[in-house]
Amino acid sequence: MKKIKLNNGTEVTMREPKVRDMRLVNGIENELDREISMLANLCEMSEDEIDDLSGKDFKKLDEALQDFLS
């Protein structure tokens, strides 16, 4: 689990992805849509909530995801 603090002060908790999470998004061709779906699932947020994030906050979540996968 990782806690990520967003620019507005909100703290988001992201769990480590499992293979089943990766399988769920495997059929999504667009890379950005795939990342949004994965982040929404791992952070227990809706895709609309992810869409409403600032670019900086999205990047923070994406970097946390990449840390899990590397």
Where do the protein language model's features map onto the residues?
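Short, surface-exposed, charged amphipathic helix/loop patches that serve as local interaction elements
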Residues: 1-70
